[in-house]
Amino acid sequence: MAGRSDWDYTRNGPSTWVERFPMAAGSRQSPVNIETDRAESDHEALSSKPLRWKYPASASRKLVNPGYCWRIDCDGEGTLLTGGPLMDDIYKLEQYHCHWGCSDSRGSEHTVDGQAFAGELHLVHWNTTKYRTFAEAAKAPDGLAVLGVFLKVGKAHEEMDKIARMLPYVSHKDEMIEIDDPIDPSKLLPVRGGRAGRCINPCMRWADRIIRPDNKCGFQDDNGYWTYLGSLTTPPCNESVTWVLFKKYIEVSHHQLNIFRNLRKFPRGEECPCHENHGVVINNFRPPLPLGNRVLRECGSF
């Protein structure tokens, strides 16, 4: 993977990444703008192989500040993502992290009909059916799967608050802390078990009763998502990701986002690079790129 000195979101920002990482100029790059009127309905695939996941809270092991976001690393044991666009392949949770802006109006990487959100949570998985390691999977076109969740400012999110309370302990780059109070990734999803917001499209109709526990495989969701083939949104921008973006968002508070914005992009003891947003981690999102001739599918009822 690339060294952090090779890229950032300011002087060495997204518009320059292609100079060091040629894959960033590929035709399967992420994020994209979700044009809802362009999405192809795929209700049959959803009903035949629903998207399913299982996330034991014990899998979340440590909170890390890599200098450009907060990230929770997982051991993957007992985790599972399958179904939907992933078909029968089994994916394991590797880590999850977040993107946000300097204000509550913009911070997501993907947009929906041009609308940005306050932030975007990414749960990154790798294909254990076909590949032996995350590194191997990251080089394959079907190696990774990322669940994307939009964040909107509203009420404080209880599970997200566990993360926010720990962030002062990893305030500077390269700091990390073991997680003592278990964090359940499934409670960060906009389905039953987490705090769900409204639908992004106000014309959509939803019913929590159709989201039900599945005894064999955690939760399964009929509640709606968009999916397309894309890439990692950070260098080296490998084109290895099947994206699943939930149509619902979760609410987080303004205070919680402000705690995110207090993270520092430089190590403790080093001089603050004050030419770069006073050294704080903000606007850590890549702008949307063309979808091109890729197929955007939607699963879920309107």
Language-model segments: residues:
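Alpha-carbonic anhydrase
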Residues: 1-302
